[in-house]
Amino acid sequence: MRKQYWFIILTYIIMQFSALIAIPLLFKFGYAGGQPTDENMLHAQGLWSVISFIACLVVVLLILRTVPKETLRNGQKDSIGLSILWAIAGFFIALFSQGIAGSIEYYVFGIGRESENTQAILDVIQAVPLMIIVSSIVGPILEEIIFRKIIFGALYEKTNFFFAGLISSVIFGIVHADLKHLLLYTAMGFTFAFLYARTKRIWVPIFAHLMMNTFVVIMQLEPVRNYLEQQSTQMQLIIGGLFL
């Protein structure tokens, strides 16, 4: 693995743990009047997430500029047009694989569909709306660079698709700190790895991941959920009226 990739991984790790030091310092220097209440902590977490993720992405992109351009296994990239089709299809494939994995977790292992990681992110978004930039744009870009381009790519050069996909996807799931849904994250990781291996273009899984995260966040926002529930109720009344 190139030394630049190790620097990128180290940058990502530092970013992930930086809140342990940064948030207490924010309060020490007077943020929110120095009062670490639950509400203020949520705001601080959101604020620092936005700052740290964007800073991390800038550093990662600058480091990537020093890496010689090469394709996965030196293979031929798919055409731009075909790659766009795969990026769009990848969004639906990711949703499908997520649904299958979620159903297996629920019906086979008795694991609830609620995700603590997703709910925690939604709570922060409610407190700091700018956080949606992290969950829907910056986060997916960083994760695809780390877990697909670097980890999957390095393993795929030495092994096969299944082994590289499995290891990188399991690590992807563990990092999300929601181990009961490890199967779900692994399924999504395999989907994004397939898109990268198929097209040889990292922006393809980035786009699919970005669209999926955006879709999930939008569908979980309270105004949207209320609207969908209202439409569902009206549809049931209409269907019920047809049989009266």
UniProtKB/Swiss-Prot annotation:
Membrane topology: Multi-pass membrane protein
UniProt-listed GO biological process terms: CAAX-box protein maturation; proteolysis
Residue numbers annotated as active site: E143, H176
Lineage: superkingdom: Bacteria
Keyword terms, alphabetized: Cell membrane, Hydrolase, Membrane, Protease, Transmembrane, Transmembrane helix
InterPro entries found in the cross-reference section: CAAX_protease, Rce1/LyrA-like_dom
Top EC class, one word: hydrolase
Enzyme Commission number: 3.4.-.-
Compartment(s) of residence: Cell membrane
GO molecular function, one term: endopeptidase activity
GO CC field: plasma membrane
TM annotation in the entry: 7-27, 44-64, 80-100, 127-147, 159-179, 202-222
Residues the UniProt record annotates as site (Transition state stabilizer): H209, N213
Family recorded in the similarity comment: Belongs to the peptidase U48 family.
Function: May function as endopeptidase which proteolytically removes the C-terminal three residues of farnesylated peptides containing the CAAX motif where C is cysteine, A is an aliphatic amino acid and X is any amino acid.
Family annotation (PANTHER family): ABORTIVE INFECTION PROTEIN, SLR1288 PROTEIN
Record protein name field: Putative membrane peptidase YdiL
